[in-house]
Amino acid sequence: MSRRRVTVKRVILADPRFKSDLLSKFINILMFNGKKSVAESIIYSALDMVLDRSSKDSCMELFEEALDNVRPVVEVKSRRVGGSTYQVPVEVRLVRRNTLAMRWIIESARKRNDKSMEMRLANELFDASEGKGNAVKKREEVHRLAESNKAFAHYRW
């Protein structure tokens, strides 16, 4: 058992426009060099663009749907047993699911070739809400890896 102190979880304030904790976390992950206002403007304009293209009522509904389609259920972790390393499938906790989904959406948006970051993020969110796009492919890839290593599930700790 570790002797270190248990760190206190920092409270992230909800974002000013939609009062959403998830969106606030998304803004923090997108942010570069502490420029939060830039990250906020990128996300808000991307959500407005997505709402124009979509048949949904609110952009938060679409954002939630995009996150749901990207959230992983299982992932693999390396476990060393008797000189060989196994990829052991483990279930992902809710907080990590959200974080991974957000990270993958932002990562996929940055790799796109659209003109501005707003446009790239809008396209990635729209694709993710429809169950396609690179972020959804990443999730399916992780699930496939966990499925193929199911035989090592008994090494879970």
From Swiss-Prot:
One cellular component (GO) term of this entry: small ribosomal subunit
Keywords: Ribonucleoprotein, Ribosomal protein, RNA-binding, rRNA-binding, tRNA-binding
InterPro entries per the UniProt record, alphabetical: Ribosomal_uS7, Ribosomal_uS7_bac/org-type, Ribosomal_uS7_CS, Ribosomal_uS7_dom, Ribosomal_uS7_dom_sf
Recorded superkingdom: Bacteria
Segments traversing the membrane: none
GO molecular function: rRNA binding; structural constituent of ribosome; tRNA binding
GO biological process: translation
Xref: CDD domains: uS7_Bacteria
Record flagged with keyword tRNA-binding: yes
Function: One of the primary rRNA binding proteins, it binds directly to 16S rRNA where it nucleates assembly of the head domain of the 30S subunit. Is located at the subunit interface close to the decoding center, probably blocks exit of the E-site tRNA.
Assembly and interaction partners: Part of the 30S ribosomal subunit. Contacts proteins S9 and S11.
Similarity section: Belongs to the universal ribosomal protein uS7 family.
Name by which UniProt lists this protein: Small ribosomal subunit protein uS7
Organism: Blochmanniella floridana
Record gene name: rpsG
